A protein has these predicted regions:
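Short, conserved beta-strand segments of beta-strand-rich sandwich/propeller modules, principally
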Residues: 340-344
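Collagenous Gly-X-Y triple-helix signature in extracellular proteins
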Residues: 1-337, 347-350
Length: 353
């Protein structure tokens, strides 16, 4: 959305789950197949001013989505470099390093033959017709394929198009499949129908709706998209506030929107010298990351379900640093840690409830 300075804020991206591939045999283990819930940018399928035949593998779209250098595409005279900095590619501008580590490399089939290995991709024509993904088999109008615009897209996005619909209005979005000829690519209409004949690859008025597969082994836990890290006001025990140092019962949630907390394997956080006395857990720690919004946090898992959360120690680099001894965590009153109820401590960057 735009702020008062006419600049666009970087809001969290909402992703639609097309399939839960937990337990499905794949190269990466358990995965979620995700598609952007809205159109996220406006960009040509291929950056060219001439009529050239191009495949998905050679397109500047694939390079821009994944931050590839000029050797991966045939844009311009000798390829276009999208690896220089975060402003150049979708991958680097939309995801942190930790989030990128949770994106599974995916082999996507190309209708022109062969496969390409990518992290971020566009849906194919056939994928937009699979009922298991929530789409209609028919190529005609389908509400499940309708994609609305973010404020950035409504404002013209990367190409500066003046023909985009308003914010939350529906627009056309690219597919990776080729169109009728080699210089055309397929797309989905703003009414949810799909058009296999496609449009010219240098069309600057079509939106982008990226997709990727999330490696669930890189996910620490999930929480409600709104209120997932805030207390249940009707709960019992130590759940009346959000102050640092408290572990509270997480509010109940029956919605469909979730956010994930991903692992950061570069962190060297470790816990030692753990002692439990009544409702108090005493511990020492080392290898913590300090700075803005850095904390030692805790979750309690009961019978496999996440029930409690709290930020127990602020690591601002002043009072608490990279290591510490004899720190305390208070377990909610009436709760006992055992084989069915476990406490986990971890170092996180807190980005809101």
């Amino acid at each position: 959305k735009q702020d008062g300075s006419d600049e666009y804020n970087i809001d969290p991206i909402k992703w639609r789950v097309l399939s839960n591939e937990k337990g499905v045999q794949s190269d990466n283990g358990d995965e979620l197949f995700l598609l952007a819930d809205q159109n996220l940018d406006v960009i040509r399928y291929h950056e060219t001013n001439t009529s050239v035949s191009v495949t998905w593998a050679e397109s500047t779209m694939r390079s821009w989505l994944n931050g590839y250098d000029a050797s991966y595409n045939t844009g311009g005279n000798s390829g276009i470099d999208y690896s220089a900095d975060a402003a150049h590619s979708f991958l680097d501008s939309a995801f942190s390093e930790e989030e990128k580590n949770a994106i599974a490399g995916t082999k996507v089939e190309n209708s022109t033959g062969g496969e390409t290995q990518v992290q971020i991709f566009l849906l194919s024509l056939s994928e937009t017709r699979r009922t298991v993904y929530g789409f209609s088999r028919d190529i005609s109008k389908d509400p499940g394929r309708v994609a609305t615009n973010t404020a950035y897209v409504a404002g013209g996005g990367k190409t500066g198009s003046t023909l985009m619909s308003e914010e939350d209005g529906a627009d056309i979005w690219w597919l990776r499949s080729p169109g009728l000829t080699g210089d055309y690519a397929a797309f989905a209409y703003n009414d949810g129908s799909v058009y296999s004949n496609g449009s010219h690859v240098n069309n600057e008025n079509f939106a982008v709706r990226p997709a990727f597969k999330l490696n669930l082994e890189e996910v620490l836990f999930t929480s409600a998209a709104v209120g997932g890290k805030v207390p249940d006001a009707s709960g019992s025990g130590n759940c009346g506030g959000v102050a640092v140092g408290e572990i509270f019962e997480i509010a109940s949630y029956d919605g469909d929107d979730w956010k994930v907390t991903v692992l950061d394997k570069d962190r060297k956080f470790a816990i030692s010298d753990v002692e439990i006395s009544g409702d108090t857990v005493t511990f020492s720690y080392s290898g913590a990351r300090t700075g803005k919004n850095e904390y030692i946090s805790a979750v309690i898992v009961t019978n496999g379900e996440l029930t409690h959360y709290g930020r127990v120690l602020e690591l601002d680099g002043t009072a608490n640093g990279e290591s510490g001894k004899n720190k305390n965590v208070s377990i909610p009153s009436g709760m006992t840690l055992d084989a069915d109820t476990e406490l986990y401590l971890f170092n996180e960057q807190y980005n809101g409830g």
